[in-house]
Every structure is written in structure tokens, then in C-alpha cells.
Regions:
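Assembly/oligomerization scaffold segments
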Residues: 1-283, 334-335, 391-449, 496-504, ...
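N-terminal export/assembly leaders
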Residues: 293-321
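Extended amphipathic alpha-helical segments with heptad-repeat/coiled-coil character used for oligomerization
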Residues: 337-359
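C-terminal, active-site-flanking charged/polar segments
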Residues: 353-359, 440-442, 446-452, 520-557
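C-terminal, non-catalytic macromolecule-binding modules
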Residues: 441-471
């Protein structure tokens, strides 16, 4: 019997504290290097002369004369009662304020038993203090503290005759929601990908967890919700018979709590694109799409992405105005005939889709199948602009300004701008930045681009019997005539796939964009071949998906005779 489960791993970290930290101590052995505590280096548990420390079975290597993997090895060994003559002390300094819900310590060998931590603000005032009983080599010291500039970590007791051996600190920890973590009441994943890239749909993950201790309640002033940051990364997984399958990387969008039930809403990489503005557009005359995609991703702060070579090489013609990164990327991908997808991946991937079958949905996995025909489309029209630079310079705008630095965004592209009453410091086709030394009228002039809209239409040769002509229209701002014709024909071919399927089935890693062979419940009538365009998955109710697909009917004729299989004979139980 199949068993499933869901969990999300949330990195509850102050993401800038490690790089901003400087660790110091006066209690380290000469061979220890405390600066390496900023790195998660592998440190073996060396055999030492601590009393009754290790067996002579080869599990503890001999320490070399000059080890390069020892971070902190206290200068003093604990006594018979586990205390120290002078407690080992670590001090961590920061140049900026930091906030964390906890500190995670990584020790080597026998961990200390007790420690104290003091949090200090930028003025030298102690803002929090806590004592901890350490119970593992990876120990999480929970304490929600805001705006600290200094940490003082004092080790007060260990096992008898032991050194404190510390190797790494993290300014936070992973929070698990679901399997082996906070219990999740329900979880739903909605994934969508438009194969013609007329829109970039956002994948959304929503789950409700049972918050017995009010850790996520905004009213709890010491709750871990205080370190929630919009855009923090969450890795989501589904387990099938104990084996974890990656659902994707998601980012915190919003959360709320009602009666100990916290609702966490997350978006994928495509959702991040909507939160950032792309200002680097211009008038393009054949520049490769890959360069522009790199600029869009940089503007959105996304580094984990791939772009296939065919998409990278596609030329762009037209203009990209100032707008959010998702809308900008839609223009580029529509022109390229490429899609963007992040499902079942740690990265976001951009590529030209194909109709290669990646998965098979057998009868044994299906609960229901509802086929229907989509509306008939006979014509596809694609409108695109053609820009030409005017010969003469004209006034673009004028206004009165007091001394200062200003940036003016343009509603239409211009070039070769000049100014009276100020000094231009930066200009692009989309905006101009200038400085004003004295109050007065500022006039910006330049050569404007004239625009002419053209439309290319792809049509079927003959309208199907009983149908009438129906046109679908699209617009793209970075196409030329040849590309518009190719895109119109490709979209028309897509609309020729009129079969729409709605199926409910047991998911085994199936994802949007993939093409699937869906077996018909009636074995006499072949199967369906279709691309998964949208899928909603119940992550806590059996990993059951409801998907919408578009494709065609694969008819299996009875008029074949191949090998030992004859007409009418079953050719495999699916």
C-alpha cells in the first residue's frame, strides 16, 4: 500500500550574519584557527589524551603536528567536576545589527554540557542573556533576539577532563513543517505553465500547520515569526513510501494565524520576478535573448537558473519598457517560443518545449478522465511594433526643479538626449538621470523613436466542416516580421490540438510542461497524448493531482499484425 507525506524545510536564518561576523577568543590552542568558524569545514574527532576518551580501534585518527581543520580547541581542560578554572569564552562581533530566532552550534567529540550566551547591542548594552544545557553535538540555542551587534559565548561545564571543541556556528536553523516537524493539517500545490508563453503563471504552495505553541502567531512577541522575511527560501518535498521527492524551491509570500492554525503561502521563482522592476530595457536590433534574460534575472536577484542554447541565441527586435521582471520576461519568452518552469527543481529553467512523452499515466493511477474539445481556432494574429529613430531632436519634457539629483522615466523610447538647466549623468532609451545646481526650468530634448504596429496572421487553409472562422490575437514588443510569422504558425499548430483532458490521478513525480501518454479507461479505444498545462495537487491527502492537459487522441487501430500480436489482442496491461 502506498504511503505519502509532505514536508517543507524552511531556512530560518539571518542570511547576512555569517559574512558580517568576526570571531575572536583568548582561549584557543595555538593550532586552532577561530576564523574558520565562518565555514562549515569537516573536522575529524582526533584522538587526544583526555581521560577515557577513545578506544584503540582506529576510529579516532592521530592529530597531525600542524592540523588545518581545528577551529576551536579550548586552552584549558575541565576538571574532575567538569568545570573550568577560567571559562572558555568566544566573542563574535558584527558591523551591522542582526536578528535571529536561535543560534546553532556544531561541536566535535564530546560536546560541552552547559553554556551561557549574552547578546549585546551597538551601544554595548546587554539586551538578552540565557543559559543552556547542551545535549548534542549539533545544538540549537533558541532565543529570539533582535538588533544585536555582539555575542559572548561562555562554556561553563563539560564532561570531566574534556576540552571544548567547537567548529561552526549558524545564525538560525531549519524549521521543518510536515513529516518529523510541525504537523501540517493540509497542503496544496498549484502549478501552471503556458506552452506558448502568452503568460508566465506563478506556482503557488499553501499549507496549514498546527501551531500548538503559537510560534507563528504574530501576537507572540518571542515567536519565530519575527525572523520571517519575505522571499526567504523554502524547499518542499513529498515522500512516497518513505522516499523524498523534491517539489521545488519556494519563497515566503505571506502568512497568517487563526486559532493555532498558521497558513503559510509561498511562490516559486516566477513569483519573485513580479516583485522586482526591470529598468535595463532598450530598443533592440538583434541582440541575443540570453543577454537580456541574464539582465532580467540579475534585476530580480535570481542566480539559480538555466537557459538552453536555442533560447540564448534567439535575436530580439523592438523595445522593452520599464516594467516588472515577470512581464518583461514574458515578452522575451514569447518572442523566443520558450517556456519558464521551476517545478520539481531547485532552479528555474528556461527552454524551448518539445512534445516528447516524458511520463505515462496508466489506468491503475487514474481516478477519472474527462475529455472535451476546445474551441475551434482558424487564425492566429500576432501584432508587433517596428521602431525607427527620428532624424530631428525634439523636446521630450520640461519642468522646474530645485537643486538635486533626479531620474525621469520615459513613456516611449528616446536617444541622444540633451539638457538645458542641468547636467545629464546617465541616459538610456527608457530614462534619464540629471543633476540640477540651481533652481530653474529644465528642458530635456532628444531624438524620439517612431512606432508602427504591424500584424502577421497565420490561417488554416480550409475551415473544418461545421465550424466558422475564429481568430486569436497576441501582442509582443520584441519581434520582427519573420519571427512574428513563425510564432503565429506555431501557436496555430498548438490550437490545432483541440483535445482537452481533465484527469485525477496518483502523482508519481509528474509535472507541468511534460507530455504524457494517458491511457483510456476503455481499452478498445487507444490512449491520449497531451501536455500538462496546469496541475493542482493535494500534498497531504495521498499526493493526488487534478490536471488539465491539451493534446490529441492516439487511436490504436485493429488493423495491424506485428510479430505475435494480432488484431484485437491486448498488447500489454497498463
Amino acid at each position: 500500500m502506498r504511503t505519502t507525506g509532505f514536508y517543507a524545510k524552511y531556512g530560518l536564518y539571518d542570511t547576512t550574519a555569517r559574512e558580517d561576523s568576526t570571531l575572536t577568543t583568548a582561549y584557543n590552542q595555538s593550532f586552532g584557527d577561530i576564523s574558520k568558524a565562518k565555514e562549515d569545514i569537516s573536522a575529524p574527532d582526533y584522538g587526544t589524551l583526555e581521560q577515557d576518551y577513545f578506544l584503540l580501534d582506529g576510529t579516532h585518527p592521530e592529530m597531525p603536528d600542524n592540523p588545518d581543520d581545528v577551529v576551536f580547541f579550548s586552552s584549558e581542560m575541565s576538571g574532575a567536576d567538569g568545570t573550568f578554572t577560567e571559562n572558555p569564552l568566544l566573542i563574535i562581533l558584527f558591523t551591522e545589527n542582526h536578528t535571529s530566532a536561535c543560534l546553532t552550534f556544531h561541536f566535535v567529540g564530546d560536546h560541552p554540557l552547559e553554556m551561557k550566551i549574552r547578546w549585546v547591542d551597538g551601544s554595548g548594552n546587554y539586551i538578552e542573556y540565557a543559559s543552556y544545557e547542551v545535549d548534542s553535538n549539533k545544538f540549537v540555542a533558541w532565543k529570539q533576539v533582535e538588533n544585536y551587534r555582539r555575542l559572548e559565548i561562555e562554556f561553563t561545564r563539560a564532561m570531566p577532563y574534556r576540552y571544548v571543541k567547537f567548529r561552526y556556528i549558524e545564525y538560525g536553523t531549519d524549521i521543518i513543517c510536515g513529516v518529523d516537524g510541525y504537523p501540517v493539517k493540509e497542503a496544496k500545490l498549484v502549478e501552471e505553465c503556458d506552452p506558448i508563453s502568452n503568460k508566465i503563471a506563478i506556482n503557488k504552495l499553501t499549507f496549514k500547520l498546527i501551531d500548538e505553541k503559537n510560534d507563528f502567531d504574530i501576537g507572540n512577541m518571542s515567536g519565530i515569526h519575527k525572523v520571517f522575511q519575505s522571499g526567504q527560501k523554502v524547499m518542499a518535498y513529498e515522500t512516497i513510501n518513505g522516499e523524498a521527492q523534491l517539489l521545488g524551491a519556494f519563497f515566503l509570500d505571506s502568512y497568517s494565524t487563526t486559532k493555532n492554525i498558521s497558513t503559510i503561502s509561498l511562490v516559486d521563482y516566477k513569483g519573485l520576478l513580479s516583485k522586482h522592476t526591470f529598468r535595463g530595457g532598450k530598443v533592440y536590433t538583434g541582440e541575443p535573448a540570453g543577454e537580456v534574460i541574464d539582465q532580467i534575472m540579475a534585476a530580480a536577484g535570481i542566480t539559480a537558473y538555466t537557459v538552453d542554447e536555442a533560447t540564448r541565441a534567439a535575436p530580439l527586435y523592438g523595445w522593452l519598457k520599464i516594467q516588472d521582471c515577470r512581464k518583461t520576461l514574458r515578452e522575451v519568452l514569447f518572442a523566443c517560443g520558450s517556456v519558464i518552469d521551476s517545478s520539481r527543481s531547485e532552479t528555474v529553467n528556461i527552454y524551448k518545449p518539445s512534445r516528447v512523452i516524458h511520463t505515462t499515466i496508466q489506468r491503475s493511477r487514474k481516478f477519472s478522465t474527462t475529455p472535451k474539445n476546445q474551441s475551434y481556432i482558424s487564425d492566429v494574429a500576432v501584432k508587433f511594433p517596428v521602431y525607427s529613430l527620428d532624424e530631428e531632436s525634439k523636446e521630450i519634457f520640461k519642468s522646474t526643479y530645485v537643486p538635486g539629483i533626479y531620474t525621469v522615466d520615459l513613456s516611449s523610447p528616446s536617444a541622444e538626449m540633451t539638457i538645458t538647466g542641468g547636467t545629464i549623468t546617465e541616459q538610456t532609451n527608457n530614462y534619464v538621470t540629471f543633476t540640477v545646481a540651481e533652481e530653474g526650468e529644465v528642458v530635456i530634448s532628444g531624438r524620439k523613436y517612431s512606432k508602427e504596429d504591424l500584424t502577421v496572421t497565420a490561417s488554416v487553409e480550409k475551415v473544418d466542416a461545421g465550424e466558422s472562422r475564429e481568430t486569436k490575437s497576441f501582442t509582443c514588443t520584441v519581434l520582427n516580421a519573420s519571427q512574428a510569422a513563425d510564432r503565429a504558425q506555431a501557436i496555430l499548430d498548438y490550437y490545432d490540438l483541440r483535445l482537452n483532458l481533465k484527469i485525477k490521478f496518483l502523482n508519481e513525480g509528474d509535472k507541468v510542461v511534460d507530455w504524457a501518454e494517458v491511457f483510456n479507461a476503455n481499452r478498445k479505444f487507444g490512449s491520449y497524448v497531451a501536455g500538462i498545462e496546469k496541475m493542482t495537487t493535494d500534498l497531504t491527502g495521498g499526493y493526488i493531482s487534478t490536471a488539465e492537459l491539451r493534446g490529441y487522441y492516439k487511436l490504436v487501430e485493429d488493423f495491424y499484425y506485428t510479430g505475435e500480436i494480432i488484431a484485437g489482442e491486448e498488447f500489454g496491461e497498463m
